[in-house]
């Protein structure tokens, strides 16, 4: 299993190819465009760990921006007892959803996301015989 720990938005994320993650809004990137995360703190490739000091040089995590969205609403309610003072406010954090495509070290991809055509199983129409092929009428089944 290959994974990397990257830093984005002041937070650290454990990322794996083929998975998507929600990070704080990346305003400078448009939807469905590639984005490189260059602040890689650690890479684990088949048990071999590469640790940065603080970042791994020549390491890049390639991602694609799937969408910009807003998170769930969080209600903030402030109340001072016995004073009839109440404030109810809501907050929705702006987020960006990233799909991790590959983890690269020194320009060599260590792991890539499986393509969608490989992951989708093919339908086999011959797997289940129809009623006409078996000779049993549909009423008796």
UniProtKB/Swiss-Prot annotation:
Any one GO cellular component localisation term in the record: ribonucleoprotein complex
| Cross-referenced InterPro entries | bL21-like (IPR028909), bL21-like_sf (IPR036164), Ribosomal_bL21 (IPR001787), Ribosomal_bL21_CS (IPR018258)
Question: Which PROSITE patterns does the record cross-reference, listed alphabetically?
Answer: RIBOSOMAL_L21
The molecular function terms of the Gene Ontology recorded here are: rRNA binding; structural constituent of ribosome
> Which domain of life does this protein belong to?
Bacteria
A biological process from GO:
translation
Composition-biased stretches (Low complexity): 118-133
Q: Where is this region: Disordered?
A: 111-141
Recite the UniProt keywords alphabetically: Ribonucleoprotein, Ribosomal protein, RNA-binding, rRNA-binding
The free-text function statement in the UniProt record for this protein reads: This protein binds to 23S rRNA in the presence of protein L20.
Q: How does it assemble?
A: Part of the 50S ribosomal subunit. Contacts protein L20.
Instruction: Write out the similarity annotation.
Output: Belongs to the bacterial ribosomal protein bL21 family.
Q: What is this protein called?
A: Large ribosomal subunit protein bL21
The species this protein belongs to is: Synechococcus sp. (strain JA-2-3B'a(2-13))
What high-level taxonomic lineage is stated for the organism? Bacteria, Bacillati, Cyanobacteriota, Cyanophyceae, Synechococcales
Gene name in the database record = rplU
């Amino acid at each position: 299993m290959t994974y990397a720990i990257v830093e984005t938005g002041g937070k650290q994320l454990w990322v794996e190819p083929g998975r998507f993650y929600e990070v704080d809004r990346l305003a400078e990137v448009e939807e469905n465009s590639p984005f490189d995360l260059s602040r890689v703190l650690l890479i684990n490739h088949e048990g071999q760990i590469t640790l940065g000091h603080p970042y791994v040089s020549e390491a890049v995590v390639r991602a694609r921006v799937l969408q910009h969205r807003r998170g769930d609403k969080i209600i903030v309610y402030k109340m001072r007892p016995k004073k009839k003072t109440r404030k109810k406010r809501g907050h929705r954090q702006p987020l960006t959803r990233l799909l991790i495509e590959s983890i690269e070290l020194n320009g060599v991809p260590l792991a890539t996301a499986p393509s969608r055509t490989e992951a989708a199983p093919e339908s086999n129409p011959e797997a289940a015989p129809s009623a006409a092929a078996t000779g049993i009428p549909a009423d008796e089944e």
